[in-house]
């Protein structure tokens, strides 16, 4: 394992007010308004920059922390390409997406990677005006709708009018159940790659196994071969040096069960997916067709993510926040949104004890944040996030 000396920083994070229940989302990918994130805390962070060149010897492990970081150069960084090349949809599809697929395969050892979406961000979050802030996010949702009907994977934010901004709200896009809904509902290319996973899980659900108990069958029991491995990742890269509002990642190893807040959310759905793969099975009535996912106009369906309450430990280190200081375009964050292999063995700790809960965890809570001492007059950070599904 690599040996590094952690450097501590502090930053401002926005959590749900403890005890508050988040409102249901009304648009795909739209988090609750900033007004619901009333618990604003200044918390310590560890700088991961010294780990970037350690490769597989990095102390930050996907299977433990839910994230890692790598130094990774893209062909789009060198001539004849320039900054605006990152807004060229053809170049992203022909050059960058294959680079991401290769990186994920190299880091995880998976056999297949399906790129499912890309998001470019280049706006400031207008915190002082909640209506304006919501509109900035809404522009992004409109862009999602527009792009989802065209080429796959959708690329959002490559037009100056899209107005996509960082999300200064502590969250994780998918719960384990949300991840399983995603591979069934989001797009036929993801679902096709996940067919063996879905069929294995559906056999268990039809036998009465509950959704939350699927984690116990990853390795299989008795004569069952178990559920094949799948994972969902976000590969996050700045497009210029980051001088404000960096992205932080919370460690799965220390984030307590009591601070995870399940939240109903909406996600685009593909109506062309075969019914036997897209259906949602009720283990208590497996022969009935369950369509209670809040299907609404615009081709969305209900899924589940996590928001969070702030830490209550005395030193306020329970959430184990990490980031890369002065992050450069070759400093890439690999964020695990879900991994069913990790979920099979990893449990969220119980707050204030050395014991583990029964909550299976498979992905890392994350958030944009205000770094203490950052230049508040600096230009908005610019980044590209590529989401992908991996299969073994």
Swiss-Prot record:
Function per UniProt: Oxidoreductase; part of the gene cluster that mediates the biosynthesis of the yellow pigment chrysogine. the NRPS chyA mediates the condensation of anthranilic acid and alanine into the intermediate 2-(2-aminopropanamido)benzoic acid. The remainder of the pathway is highly branched yielding at least 13 chrysogine-related compounds. The malonyl transferase chyE converts 2-(2-aminopropanamido)benzoic acid and 2-(2-aminopropanamido)benzamidine into 2-(2-(2-carboxyacetamido)propanamido)benzoic acid and 3-((1-((2-carbamoylphenyl)amino)-1-oxopropan-2-yl)amino)-3-oxopropanoic acid, respectively.
Protein name in UniProt: Oxidoreductase chyM
Keyword Oxidoreductase: yes
Disruption phenotype: Impairs the production of N-pyruvoylanthranilamide ans downstream compounds and accumulates 2-(2-aminopropanamido)benzoic acid and 2-(2-((4-amino-1-carboxy-4-oxobutyl)amino)propanamido)benzoic acid.
Pathways per UniProt: Pigment biosynthesis
Alphabetical list of InterPro entries matching this protein: AsaB-like
Organism (species): Penicillium rubens (strain ATCC 28089 / DSM 1075 / NRRL 1951 / Wisconsin 54-1255) (Penicillium chrysogenum)
GO MF annotation terms: oxidoreductase activity
S-S bridge residues: none
Primary enzyme class: oxidoreductase
Gene (UniProt): chyM
Family: Belongs to the asaB hydroxylase/desaturase family.
TM stretches of this protein: none
Signal peptide residues on this chain, from the entry's feature table: none
Classification via PANTHER family: BLL6449 PROTEIN, OXIDOREDUCTASE AN1597
Keyword Oxidoreductase: yes
